Amino acid sequence: KEGEQVEMKVGISFVDMEGAANNFKQEIASKNFAQVKQEASDLWNKELSRIRISGGTDDEKTVFYTSLYHTMIDPRIYTDVDGRYIGGDKKVHEQDGTFTKRTIFSGWDVFRSQFPLQAMINPRLVSDALNSLITMADQSRREYYERWELLNSYSGCMIGNPALSVLADAYMKGIRTYDVEKAYQYAVNTSAKFGNDSLGYTPEPLSISYTLEYAYADWCVAQLAKALGKEEDAKRFYEKGKAYRNMFDAEKGWFRPRNADGSWKAWPENALTEEWYGCIESNAYQQGWFVPHDVPGMVELMGGKEEVIANLTNLFDHTPSDMLWNDYYNHANEP
């Protein structure tokens, strides 16, 4: 009836009905809505206090903490209160106390933003995520990392090898609470399975995006190999990290899609700003800057410092002030 409120409690589980009932009993059976709301508020206040800011307006602080909240939604806990979870082999496993199983690693979205941040403010979460990816690769017997994990699935969504970046970044920041040798071997396996090895680049379709992102991931493996004292591996992966050069057409002065036979894809009139021209959710003008691991090499390839400054100036000068989706600096998307 009008003015009445209905309070409903629900127990859920990723494992089974018994797990849902147990989760319900342990977490909310004896609590009312106000109690659950307050506990949730307290938990979020605790998590958001990992970063404290000063200055600015109240609106700006709201924007900041809302954004920080968004970085903490996933990867989410995948276990029941009793520690059981579904593993990469689709069987029920029990936590061994070393980590909390988590799910939803949207790799392409998060390796260059969310995870470097979380590695600094919430290393336990990053450790959980890496252990979850490692055990999934182990339990499934695939022995390589998924780029976009969802409920233990190897979805293959998007591109690149983002887990290799997350692993290397975490290791360099002192997050090493996992089987390091196994983690490293799975990184090597991932690069061999998905990478630029065959031709020195990845051919069409989306050849610019694939090649540049694989090259960066290989450089990450090189960094990890060097830190682990694997010098020969480090040299090999540093060389693989230079694969981005194979996508640069000196005649056109920019990165250009390439076919499997080595030929260049036809160059349209608006080649630099044509979306999906060798790139995923972007264009060559945007994706071409993705050489974070070798900026000096990129600058040399592009014609030197002055040429790069001119290109960057043009990129930002043509970016709309509202920062909405556009053909230049597209802050609204990942590349």
Enumerate the predicted regions with their spans:
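Short, glycine/acidic-rich hinge or "gate" loops at secondary-structure transitions
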Residues: 80, 84-86, 128-135, 143-150, ...
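Intrinsically disordered or highly flexible coil/loop and linker segments, enriched in small
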Residues: 5, 15-20, 49-57, 73-81, ...
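Carboxylate/His-rich catalytic cores and anion/metal-binding grooves
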Residues: 56-81, 117-136, 154-185, 245
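Generic detector of well-ordered alpha-helical segments enriched in charged/polar residues
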Residues: 21-26, 34-45, 49, 65, ...
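Acidic/polar, glycine-enriched structural segments that form the non-catalytic walls/loops
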Residues: 1-101, 135, 142-143, 181
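Active-site core of glycosidic bond-cleaving carbohydrate-active enzymes
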Residues: 97-115, 120-122, 160, 164, ...
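Long, structured ligand/cofactor-binding scaffold of large enzymes
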Residues: 89-91, 97-107, 111-112, 118, ...
